[in-house]
Amino acid sequence: MSFVVGFDFGTKNCTIAVAQKGGVDVIANEVSNRLTPSMVSFGEKERYLGESALTNQLRNIRNTITNIKRFIGQEFKTDTVQEELKHEMFQSYEMDNGFVGYNVTYAGEQCSFSSEAILGMLFGKLKKTTEAFVNNPVRDVVISVPVFWNDYQRRAILNAGSIAGLNIIRLINETTATALSYGIYKEWSETDPTNVLFVDVGDSATSVSAVQYKKGQLKVLGTASNPNIGSRVFDETLVKHFAKEFQTKYKINVFENKKALIRLRQACEKVKKILSSNNEAPVSIDSLMDDKDVKGMIDRATFEELANDDMNTIVEPLQRLLSELQMTPDQFQSIEITGGGTRSTSLQKKLSEVLGRDLSKTINSEESVCRGAALQCAMLSPVFRVRPFAVNDVASYPVSVHFKSVSGVEQKLDLFNLKSAIPTPKPLRISFPVTKAEGFEIVVNSTFGTIATVKVDNIPAFTNKSSIKAKVWLDIHGIFHIDEVKLVEQIPEEETAAPAETPAETPANGEAAKPAEEKKVKVKETSLVFTTSRKGLTNELLKAAIEEEGRMQASDLLAIETAEKKNALESYIYDMRSKLQSSLKEYVTPADAETFMTQLNKQMDWLESEEGEDQTKSVYAGKLEELRRLGNPIQKRKQDLEDYPDAVQTLKNIASYVKNEAMIPGERYDHIEKEEKEKLCKDCDDAVEWIDALVAKQQATPKTQPCIINTTEVLAKKTQLEVTAKMILGKPKPKPVEVPKEEPKDTPMESKDAPAEEPVATKDQKMDDILD
């Protein structure tokens, strides 16, 4: 069975939803959490992904990559990236392509990774979590992205998916995914559209989307966002508040200690959640810094005062969207809030004040996006039948093209705006007139920079009116494409010689002669050879990243298996040392027990030594096998001696039952030969005699010796008796022989009216009459 999956890739956490015939399930990870941390950490032997990365973060700060979403597809020198890096603990650098890269220590070596490679590792973890849940390989997936993401970021996600071995069949905007999961199950009018406003406050960004519903479809009317502010600003506000308080009260500066700062941030995040349902919240951290335990308290009123400016910034996209659409809150049937940030009661209060109406909280703030992504995946999958529901989304960024020839001729053309549909229903044909056979460039631009540059070195010579044409479109991911660059020449068709005209009389009606027909034009198209350059990973770098990911996965698997073997060896030693003093004590001689215990202690000492701390999988496996050669015979003796009484009793029960069946008097088995029944009874007696002799011999044997009775052999004897009994006692009775009836002979002297003689009843007939 094919499974379709939706990933919600968040700044702090990821969620996974799987669409199956029974519906959409949000699945839990290996520690039963439905939220998987968006973290990747590098250790001495293996990588730690998701939950394990979070566990190792404080012990491995410099090699733990967090907030991956804030850097993927972002150029290193942008103000946004530089501001983000001020708060991070890991080492980053500018790659040759201008994007963000990471420097880490992995397996004792200095390694560098692109953002796509890091995200590919996280996606690989989500893929394995999903496969563990469905117990099948998973490949097709829809991944959510912020509605404001540009071309660079979207293509980076596709590359990360390729590195993870995923087939991303669509990148869906987060607010659109929420709108889909909200609307697909509801009944909408076919004629009267219904407007719903979605407010999504995430950890690091805020987005608002106005959606119109009609029967079988949704249409995004418009969106607005602030990419740089989300609920984490409340965490930072609380961090600054308590850092100042602790500096005054305890004389410590948490900003000077990275571990202390991380612990304080984690504590402040809990405070923020507590204040959502309580009027005050405490902070208590043991040994935060300089062996000092710290405590603090804050109430909701103080928090709202501190965070007031941040809340005003968060609601700004909402106000901006309503202004752009020239709509009022009353024109929406419902205003749905989603995202982890909307849990804050204070923020809800602020949103309600700005809108002048109540908010709706019917959406699961943490799972609506991944559910919508999984539904979209099911809708696009050929193996699922889903209720017809069209998703009409809009572009996330404007696109324009700039034509520049070698001689300096320039032309500009706007192609897509924020209201353009994605995917583009039909590719657009753009055209630029040319007058010279010379090379040119088509530069595709947007607000964030250059998307692509198409370059043609030269074009064929032409003599007629000509132009350059190209096909452009936005695909289902919201990514721009340009293709089929052609030279289009308009060639007038040659006129054929007209026959000599003879003088003709002017028509009587005085009509003038018809004017000559316009010359026909023939269009000649010539495909041009062009190169397209884009920012981001090249095909060579992507291929290398895929190969490197495969090697690292193999290394991770080996490290995990090695750790499992080491743990198995340690567990076996502890287990056997305990059992030799208890449950196995009576099954081993004192001398053998001492020898075994000596070996167990020796291996434990080796494990705890520097040599045993770091060994290969085969070494641990060999040590474990050596100990099992000593311990397995003891455990087998105990198991055999415990198992054989049940097997013996089972054999005796079967023998007794079969013998009693064979000796039942009466008609039940009277069709079976006496000799056969006697032989069956003898087989039963022989089996009992055989097992009694073995039991007597076993009872005279010490428990420290191997068990004489083979349980498997006893059960085989029982099965043999059952088969023999079935063959003999299961024979069907022969069918009674039918006596043919004699036809009555006609007697001339017999009168037809004479009464027929009643037949004399046989013994069986009389019995039948009685039974009736």
From Swiss-Prot:
<comment type="function">
    <text>May function in protein folding and assembly, and disassembly of protein complexes.</text>
</comment>
<feature type="region of interest" description="Disordered">
    <location>
        <begin position="729"/>
        <end position="772"/>
    </location>
</feature>
<dbReference type="GO" id="GO:0051082">
    <property type="term" value="F:unfolded protein binding"/>
</dbReference>
<dbReference type="GO" id="GO:0140662">
    <property type="term" value="F:ATP-dependent protein folding chaperone"/>
</dbReference>
<feature type="region of interest" description="Disordered">
    <location>
        <begin position="496"/>
        <end position="519"/>
    </location>
</feature>
<dbReference type="GO" id="GO:0005524">
    <property type="term" value="F:ATP binding"/>
</dbReference>
<keyword id="KW-0346">Stress response</keyword>
<protein>
    <recommendedName>
        <fullName>Heat shock protein 88</fullName>
    </recommendedName>
</protein>
<dbReference type="InterPro" id="IPR043129">
    <property type="entry name" value="ATPase_NBD"/>
</dbReference>
<keyword id="KW-0547">Nucleotide-binding</keyword>
<dbReference type="InterPro" id="IPR029048">
    <property type="entry name" value="HSP70_C_sf"/>
</dbReference>
<dbReference type="InterPro" id="IPR013126">
    <property type="entry name" value="Hsp_70_fam"/>
</dbReference>
<comment type="similarity">
    <text>Belongs to the heat shock protein 70 family.</text>
</comment>
<keyword id="KW-0143">Chaperone</keyword>
<feature type="compositionally biased region" description="Low complexity">
    <location>
        <begin position="497"/>
        <end position="513"/>
    </location>
</feature>
<dbReference type="Pfam" id="PF00012">
    <property type="entry name" value="HSP70"/>
</dbReference>
<dbReference type="GO" id="GO:0000774">
    <property type="term" value="F:adenyl-nucleotide exchange factor activity"/>
</dbReference>
<dbReference type="GO" id="GO:0005829">
    <property type="term" value="C:cytosol"/>
</dbReference>
<dbReference type="InterPro" id="IPR029047">
    <property type="entry name" value="HSP70_peptide-bd_sf"/>
</dbReference>
<keyword id="KW-0067">ATP-binding</keyword>
<dbReference type="GO" id="GO:0045335">
    <property type="term" value="C:phagocytic vesicle"/>
</dbReference>
<dbReference type="GO" id="GO:0006457">
    <property type="term" value="P:protein folding"/>
</dbReference>
<dbReference type="GO" id="GO:0005634">
    <property type="term" value="C:nucleus"/>
</dbReference>
<feature type="compositionally biased region" description="Basic and acidic residues">
    <location>
        <begin position="735"/>
        <end position="772"/>
    </location>
</feature>
